[in-house]
C-alpha cells in the first residue's frame, strides 16, 4: 500500500531482496524525520515470524526499505490451495506463528494496524509464516488507497477503529488475527464489508450490536450511532462450523467487541487450542 515493491538482488551476498520504495504524500518536503526514526527502530526487531527489515536507504527525498524476499502470501496460498482449510493442523501452526510474531511486536510496543492475509508472507521451504509491513502504519499512516488505487481493505479492521476511537492499541491486531483465523478455516472472509458502515453491520450481525453493558464507553465513540440495528449475537459454531470447541473458544476471545476484554496475543499462545503444537 505504501509504494512500489521491486524484486532486487543484493550484489554482495547474491540474495534476492524486496525493495520497497515509499511514496510520500509531501513529495517535495522529503522524508519526515519522525518516519525515519520509526523505521530505524524496526531494524532492531528480529523474530523468525517477522519479515526482516535489512536496511533503510534514504536517497533524493525518497525512502527505500530493504526486506528479505518472499514471493508467497497467505491470500495467494488460500486462493491456490482450497484444500488448505481442511488441514486444521496446518491452520493451527500458521495461527500460532502469526500470534508469535504479533506478540513479539507488541512486547516492543509496535502495532501493525493493517494485518491481512496479503501481508502474511510464507517461506515455502520451511512453511514459516512471517508478518510484513509491521510498524509502517505509524511511520507513514494507513493510506486510503493502495499505490495501484485499490481501496485498502476494511475486512480485518477492529470495531473500535471503525467507530472512530483515537485511543486504540494492541487489541486492534488481535481482532485482525481473529478474522484471519476464521478465514483460514472457512476459506472465505468473515466480515467482507465494502464501506465502513457495511463493515460494522457485517460485524454486528454476527457478533451482536454492542451497547454500554457489553462494551462500556462504546456509545461515546465518535462514529457510534444509536440508530444501529440491534442484532443479537450468533453462535460462532454456526459461522465457523469446521472449527472444534477449543478453536471456537479462542476465536470468541479474539473477536470480543470491547478491546479491553479481547485476549492478548501472548495469552492466546497459552490457550488450550495450542497444547498439541510443538514449535522450535
Curated annotation (Swiss-Prot):
Task: List cystine links.
Answer: none
Please give the activity regulation comment for this entry. Phosphorylation at Tyr-2 inactivates the enzyme, while phosphorylation at Thr-148 activates it.
- Which residues of this UniProt protein bind ATP? 1-5, 20
Instruction: Give all residue intervals belonging to the Protein kinase domain.
Output: 1-274
Please indicate if the UniProt record lists rRNA processing as a keyword.
no
Catalytic activity line of the entry: L-seryl-[protein] + ATP = O-phospho-L-seryl-[protein] + ADP + H(+); L-threonyl-[protein] + ATP = O-phospho-L-threonyl-[protein] + ADP + H(+); [DNA-directed RNA polymerase] + ATP = phospho-[DNA-directed RNA polymerase] + ADP + H(+)
Q: What is annotated as the active site?
A: 114 (proton acceptor)
* Family assignment from sequence similarity: Belongs to the protein kinase superfamily. CMGC Ser/Thr protein kinase family. CDC2/CDKX subfamily.
Quote the protein name from its UniProt record.
Cell division control protein 2 homolog B
User: Top-down, what is the taxonomic lineage of the species of origin?
Assistant: Eukaryota, Viridiplantae, Streptophyta, Embryophyta, Tracheophyta
